[in-house]
Amino acid sequence: MDMESNNFQYESEIKWENAGEGVVRQIMAYNDDLMMVKVKFETGAVGTPHTHPHTQATYVESGVFEFTTDGETKIVRAGDGVYMKPGVLHGCRCLEAGVLIDTFSPMRKDFVGRV
């Protein structure tokens, strides 16, 4: 493996990085094949629509979000999930402040380079 995180991650030890207006993220566990990222949104913040070649699965830890993926828009809440196919345009709008747990395969090397 070229890149790999430590075995344990502690929120208090991981730097929050700016990911847009009202959005911050922490890079959690990763290796070449997989990555987990915690993303915190303020109410009204937008995850700008974008594409990437990675498969993405998102778990809504808290809050309420309007997600659009592959041309379909739905409201998701704590406990819900969203799947984004590789190369598909997707984004979200935060309706109530919350946290998303994003997983990517393969890992987002562009994220690790910023930490």
Regions found by a protein language model. Give the residues of each.
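A short, N-terminal "cap"/entry segment at the start of jelly-roll beta-barrel domains
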Residues: M1-D33
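Short acidic-glycine-tyrosine-enriched beta hairpin
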Residues: G71-P86
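Ligand-binding loop in jelly-roll beta-barrel domains
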Residues: P86-D110
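Structural motif
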Residues: V64-E66, T73, L89, V99
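Histidine-centered metal-chelating micro-motifs
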Residues: V46-G47, E66, V82, P86-G91
